[in-house]
């Protein structure tokens, strides 16, 4: 089943296979103007909700593989997770500025990223404290709104409007982080330590 909505192409696939992860140096660029004329994207408010009060955005396509990478303290890096063949679409991007790792310069730091099955979500485990790192989910290709969400909101488009990146807490709540939309079908939020991060919207 394929859904088309403007700039969004929604597809479903049950195939699984190897995914590709690419690591590259970040390249700075100017912010996209929002509807208010500001060069900085607007942010959603930070709030905490019971996990039972949100819908997590489902993901089709072949998911990225889990991966472990070695970061170097003092060096800026971008880690890109891609869906598997055939499309190799970007699934998520983790950005670590040169000052983000709280470790002596030159220290090797292990980072493990595991993709949560069937949804736009990752489990992050970094062996050093991070400050200023960010996570971006890119969902244009394999967006799948939960059926109940579409029934409530009337369309996948309406559900998408309220999406944010959240961090799952051990007490059964989700912290919806201040989330930006740097581009269409992209959500960006700060990484608040190790844990599970998902794209979700309130019920």
Task: Go through each PLM region and give its residues.
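Proteolytic processing hotspots in large secreted/extracellular or virion-associated proteins
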Residues: 46-68, 75, 104-169
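N-terminal secretory signal peptides that target proteins for export/translocation
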Residues: 1-13
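Surface-exposed loop/edge segments in extracytoplasmic proteins
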Residues: 122, 171-179
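C-terminal motif of bacterial Sec signal peptides marking the signal peptidase cleavage site
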Residues: 26-28
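Bacterial signal peptide processing site
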Residues: 30-33
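Predominantly extracellular/luminal regions of secreted and cell-surface proteins
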Residues: 73-107
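Sec-dependent N-terminal signal peptides
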Residues: 12-22
